[in-house]
Amino acid sequence: MDNRQQIHLENLSLRYRGIETSALKHISVDAEFGHVIGIIGNHHAGKTSLCRALAGIVPTIISGDVTGTIQVGSLSPNLDWQKYNQQTGVVLQNPAGQLSGLADTVADEIAFDLINQGVPADQIKRRVLNVADQLGLGDQLNQSPGTLSGGQKQRLAIATAIVTDPSILVLDDPTSEMDPLGRQHFFSWLVSVEKKTIFIVSNEVDDLCEIADQIWVLKAGELVAAGKPLTVFNHLKP
């Protein structure tokens, strides 16, 4: 397979500064670019650390040592962080923490990165309305972000991540604060997303299996299974 159409992790390890134990240990796996990769595992399995590595957050923002290879299509955070970052949308576990804090309204928050990129005003308005509609935030565009519920803030974080049209999405438990209807809407939306490579951590395993092309299972920082959902869960059965 052309490596520009492949996700390739080889011997990936991550250790945070000041912590002796590695959070990720020698992970090697391949998948197809443009697929949805579901990441599951128990508490402290390394799911968030893998998201941070895939997003390039470690070591550029959070101090740590990353060794091995991360290649997502033609992009790699190891080789060109700036170019990789421009094509990557990230949603962290704490959605409020990744909002700018500078926007008066939900619409302004969604538009924040587009404004910084110098996108024309008419395009900004169109793209903001589009992603707000996709994520069920159309009625909240004139509200202050601080007035939103936890689930709405998660949807706002997703909106800010996708409005720049990245080719890679890294979503770390993006539905943890959503109610059942919100989660259902999110996974229905995710099915409709095209031409993006999506890495998603979720405890909603049944929903994840419905939409994921591959499941990666982590345990104590190691990859213990990877493959199509049915294959993986048959393998994990006692």
Predicted segment positions?
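Conserved ABC ATPase signature
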Residues: 144-148
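Conserved catalytic motifs of ABC-family nucleotide-binding domains
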Residues: 165
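Catalytic Walker B motif of ABC-type/P-loop ATPase nucleotide-binding domains
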Residues: 169-172
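ABC ATPase NBD Q-loop/coupling interface
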Residues: 69-83
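Conserved beta-strand-loop-alpha-helix hinge in the C-terminal portion
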Residues: 222-238
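Conserved H-loop
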Residues: 204-210
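Conserved ABC ATPase "signature" region
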Residues: 122-140
